[in-house]
Swiss-Prot record:
Keywords: ATP-binding, Cell inner membrane, Cell membrane, Membrane, Nucleotide-binding, Translocase, Transport. ATP binds at G43, P44, S45, G46, S47, G48, K49, S50. It comes from Chlorobium luteolum (strain DSM 273 / BCRC 81028 / 2530). This is Lipoprotein-releasing system ATP-binding protein LolD 2. The gene is lolD2. GO terms for molecular function: ATP binding; ATP hydrolysis activity; transmembrane transporter activity.
């Protein structure tokens, strides 16, 4: 049996709107993700999808409950240490690519490795180029973001997210700003990363086609899991 990579226990998230008013985003949610899973998270706007993703990745903290990443309780981890954990274990991809405009593709992909400091500059550059090759941008090494299409920019962002060989790849609406052709290239890339490399992928999306190409689909309503299903070719095969 594959190892558990992520566990959430009785997560609650509240926002303080004023001194006397609090809004509950996630009332009480528990969830386990196994290493190597491809999970899509869907739900209407305001259902808590992105909040849940940020809690999973240590970008936000729950009001109560526990979060375990790769067997480690990260719930109360100090921000400095959490930054180190994110750099080593989590790759983030957002709706907007957030590439540094003054740097070319190789330099953008290199950035997390330079921050991590585990590779030499030569090794860092070689790995950055290999990752760009993997996302089919081998002819764009020296291009800056302004010289790339939206789909190409997002593929550079995916390569950057993979730079430090993360345990978990998290995507928040990664195809939200892309046309259908570019979105399909991103779909295929996520599928290949998961199937060929065993990469754990968790993606928040409004895109039904993307959601159904995952191996597991979790649907949220009002911060609660309404359904959690294993999929095969987009069809539920087992209720969990």
């Amino acid at each position: 049996m594959a190892d558990e990579i992520l566990r959430l226990e009785h997560i609650q998230k509240e926002l303080e709107l004023s001194r006397d008013v609090r809004q509950t985003i996630i009332p009480n949610l528990s969830l386990r993700i196994t290493a190597g899973e491809f999970v899509s998270i869907t739900g209407p706007s305001g259902s808590g999808k992105s909040t849940l993703l940020y809690i999973m990745g240590g970008l936000d903290k729950p009001s109560s409950g526990r979060v375990f990443l790769d067997g480690e309780d990260i719930t109360e981890t100090e921000e400095k240490e959490m930054t180190r954990i994110r750099n080593r274990k989590i790759g983030f991809i957002y709706q907007f690519h957030f590439l540094l405009p003054e740097f070319n593709a190789v330099e953008n992909v290199s950035m997390p490795m330079l921050i991590g400091g585990r590779l030499s500059r030569k090794e860092t550059r070689e790995r950055a180029m290999a990752l760009l090759d993997m996302v089919e941008l081998q002819d764009k090494y020296t291009n800056k973001p302004s010289q790339l299409s939206g789909g190409q920019q997002q593929r550079v962002a995916i390569a950057r997210a993979l730079a430090n060989e993360p345990k978990v790849l998290l995507g928040d609406e990664p195809t939200g700003n892309l046309d259908s052709r570019s979105a399909d290239k991103v779909y295929q890339l996520f599928e290949r990363l998961n199937r060929e490399l065993g990469q754990t992928v968790i993606v928040v999306t409004h895109d039904e086609e993307f959601a159904n190409r995952a191996g597991r689909r979790i649907h949220l309503v009002d911060g609660k899991i309404e359904s959690d299903r294993v999929l095969r070719d987009g069809v539920p095969v087992l209720s969990q």
